Each structure stands twice: as C-alpha cells, then as structure tokens.
C-alpha cells in the first residue's frame, strides 16, 4: 500500500474507466523478523494487485529500496520510487519498535526470534467502489489485532493487543484509515490496473484434464487438474450422476505455477468400473462456459498376442546374433591391436 501523499504525485495521470471486469484488490504484506545477536530485525514488504506481485522491499539488500517486479511499474518516475522506498523504510522502523514493545509486554526472552506480520489493502468491486478494507497484524504466527469489516472498530486477540487497541481508538486511527481505503487506496488500485492492464486484466483459461490412479482392486482416484490459468480464482467440483460430491472431494489450495499462472486439482475416490458416472466441472472467468470433463480411458492395444510373442522371438534372435558378432569382432580387433584395446573400451 503506497503512502497517502503519493497519490498527489500521481493524480495528474489518472484517466481511468468507471467499470471493471470483476473485483480487484490491492495488498501490502510485511514481515519483520528479529534475530538476536545479528543486528536489527529484517523487514520484507511485498505489494500485490490481485495475484500479481509488483513491488518488493528487503532491508537486507545491498541498497534497501522498493524494487519493481513487473515491467509496467518500471515506468514510474523517480518521485514514485523515493516515496515508496521511504514508506517501506518508515514501516520497517515502526515494526522494529513494535517488536521490542511486544517482547516486553509478553515478558519474553530476548534470546529467541520473533515475527511481526502485517497486511493492509482494499478490495474494489466492478463498479469501482470499496468492497472491503483491511488492516491487520499477527505476532509469532497468531492473530494480534485487526480492523473490523465496518472499518470503525478493532478486534484484539488478547489483553496485550488491547493495549494497541486503546491506542488506536485514542488516535481515531480507524477513521483515518477508512478515509484512505475509500479514497486513495482505490485510486491507486485503478491506476495500477490501467497501467498494467495487459497483465492484470487478462484472463488465461485453464487447461484441464482428468487423471486416473488405481489404488487397489476396489478403488481408484480420479484427479481433475486445472493448469495455466489466471487470475487465481477458480472453482473445481466433482459430480456423480449429476449430484455434487462436496463431502467426498479432496481439494488442494490454488498454487502458483512459477510462470505467472496458477494450478489446482480436485480428486475423488471411486469404485472400479464406475468412473464414467463422475464428471469434473471447471469454472473460471477465462472460460466462455464451464468445462465438463470425464476420464477418457486409453484404448487397448490391437496387436494380437501371438504377433507380439513372435515379434519378441525374432527380436531376441536378432539381439543374440548382434551380441555374438560384436564379441567376435572385438576378439579379432583385440588380436590385431592389443596395444590400443584399453583406449577403445567403453
């Protein structure tokens, strides 16, 4: 999430459409990790539009600064990078102080490593309006404090987090942040969507297929794969005779493929011989209509068994003859050139 005053630098270039295909999001993720005896905590921040990372900051870099991760953001001018880098450095210092305070409030030893994570951002609907805003923190992998959906109140996870909650309430931080979410966060998101529209507003349809994996004589797994799709939002379901098999479906989380697209699978265990009663249904915004797939059994070989056996006999004879010939040639060659035999050996 960019600093509030950054929008003033960018406002002259905001000539954007009023409607969008689907909803979109802008997210700023941060992680501060203490490392006793090895200097200040390390701070890493990444920023995403939808499922695409486009900015990254690492305090351990040779020159700590906000770095572009997508070509479309490289067009921004020097002031943009100055502001985003300054914002990340300020957050890094704030989180380092917060880590020390939390260590003291939880009465923890300074010998151990601790982690403070944050996530801020906004979701925008197709009409360009705010769907939901976020501001939350976790300490050592557990919820600490978060802004509620009403954007007016906070949820504190424990008595220590309530100290932070009282501070936020005294400073009227929820109101300040709500103003940002409803205004500048959405404006920045619209700008990024426009500048990176060839990447961010694309819809790559999934390539889907069903794989068959026998488990035993009594069971087999049908796994429905969806590969190479963007954005990450997708729905995979299995049906048996038209009835959805929600309870019996194993579904993995959508995961990045490493090339800017995503992959996912859903599996069901079925009795042998009943595979054709099951259909996989794939829904994605890149598809003109949902895909419906069944397992396609590979055709059985049509070569007669007798022909196969005869062929193997002939092949065996050929191989045997070749081996005998090679040995005889090798022996003759050895008799003629004993001095060079070792160099010729494989």
UniProtKB/Swiss-Prot annotation:
The chain crosses the membrane at residues 306-329. Induction: Up-regulated in CD4+ T cells upon stimulation via TCR and upon HIV-1 infection. Keywords: Cell membrane, Disulfide bond, Endosome, Glycoprotein, Immunity, Lysosome, Membrane, MHC I, Signal, Transmembrane, Transmembrane helix. Residues 112-203 are annotated as: Alpha-2. Residues 22-305 are extracellular. Disulfide bonds join 122-185, 224-280. Residues 330-346 are cytoplasmic. Its main location: membrane. Non-classical major histocompatibility class Ib molecule postulated to play a role in immune surveillance, immune tolerance and inflammation. Functions in two forms, as a heterotrimeric complex with B2M/beta-2 microglobulin and a peptide (peptide-bound HLA-F-B2M) and as an open conformer (OC) devoid of peptide and B2M (peptide-free OC). In complex with B2M, presents non-canonical self-peptides carrying post-translational modifications, particularly phosphorylated self-peptides. Peptide-bound HLA-F-B2M acts as a ligand for LILRB1 inhibitory receptor, a major player in maternal-fetal tolerance. This is HLA class I histocompatibility antigen, alpha chain F. The lineage of its organism: Eukaryota, Metazoa, Chordata, Craniata, Vertebrata.
């Amino acid at each position: 999430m960019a600093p509030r005053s950054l929008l003033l630098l960018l406002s002259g270039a905001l000539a954007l459409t009023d409607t969008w295909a689907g909803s979109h999001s802008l997210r700023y993720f941060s992680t501060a990790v203490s490392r006793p005896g090895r200097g200040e905590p390390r701070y890493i921040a990444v920023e995403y539009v939808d499922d695409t990372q486009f900015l990254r900051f690492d305090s351990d870099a040779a020159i700590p600064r906000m770095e572009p991760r997508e070509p479309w953001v490289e067009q921004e001018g020097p002031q943009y990078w100055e502001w985003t880098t300054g914002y990340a450095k300020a957050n890094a210092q704030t989180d380092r102080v917060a880590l020390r305070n939390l260590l003291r409030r939880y009465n923890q030893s300074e010998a151990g490593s601790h982690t403070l994570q944050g996530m801020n951002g906004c979701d925008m609907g197709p009409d360009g309006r705010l769907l939901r805003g976020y501001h939350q923190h976790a300490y050592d992998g557990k919820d600490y404090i978060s802004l509620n959906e009403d954007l007016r109140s906070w949820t504190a996870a424990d008595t220590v987090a309530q100290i932070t909650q009282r501070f936020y309430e005294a400073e009227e931080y929820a109101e300040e942040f709500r103003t940002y979410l409803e205004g500048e966060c959405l404006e920045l998101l619209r700008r990024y969507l426009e500048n990176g529209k060839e990447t961010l507003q694309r819809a790559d349809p999934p390539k889907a297929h069903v794989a068959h994996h026998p488990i035993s004589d009594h069971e087999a797994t049908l796994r429905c794969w969806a590969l190479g799709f963007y954005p990450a939002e997708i729905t995979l379901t299995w049906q048996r005779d038209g009835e959805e098999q929600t309870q019996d479906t194993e579904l993995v989380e959508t995961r990045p493929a490493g090339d800017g697209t995503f992959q996912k699978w859903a599996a069901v265990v079925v009795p042998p011989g009943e595979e054709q009663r099951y259909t996989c249904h794939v829904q994605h915004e890149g598809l003109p209509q949902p895909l419906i797939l069944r397992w396609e059994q590979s055709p059985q070989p049509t070569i007669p068994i007798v022909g196969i056996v005869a062929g193997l006999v002939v092949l065996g004879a050929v191989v045997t003859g070749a081996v005998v010939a090679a040995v005889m040639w090798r022996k003759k060659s050895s008799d003629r050139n004993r001095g060079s035999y070792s160099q010729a050996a494989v």
